[in-house]
Amino acid sequence: SDARRERVSGGETKIDLSANVLFDKDSDVIKPAGGKVIDRAAHELVEHKVSGTVSVIGYTDNLGSAAHGLDLSRRRAGAVAKVLGPQLPKGVRLVTDGKGEADPVASNDTEAGRRLNRRVTLTVKGVS
């Protein structure tokens, strides 16, 4: 699915958004289909009465230079936050960052794995 929700210990919820749906290759411009994915994630956060801080963290695969991946992941996180922010309740704070190829969720040895690693993750604390 284009948005995967997973629970993490300590009352954290993480929603992974696939960068392949959000962006064209090597781009930080959100595609129309990507906008819909962000809208759905925002709706889900509002439904669960999000408050406090939402972290928006970009990740890439290990292709290309690490410096380029880090820069791209930061720009992508910022682009997602721009669309997400206005849809969230007043008082919710967005923090953006990019981790580049760090913290992969799958092996970068296969295209399928790299596809999973290209993502923007929303992390929320204290969501019901």
Predicted segments, located by residue:
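Second-shell loop/turn segments in exported
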Residues: 21-31, 63-70
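Generic low-polarity alpha-helical segments
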Residues: 5, 13, 17, 75-77
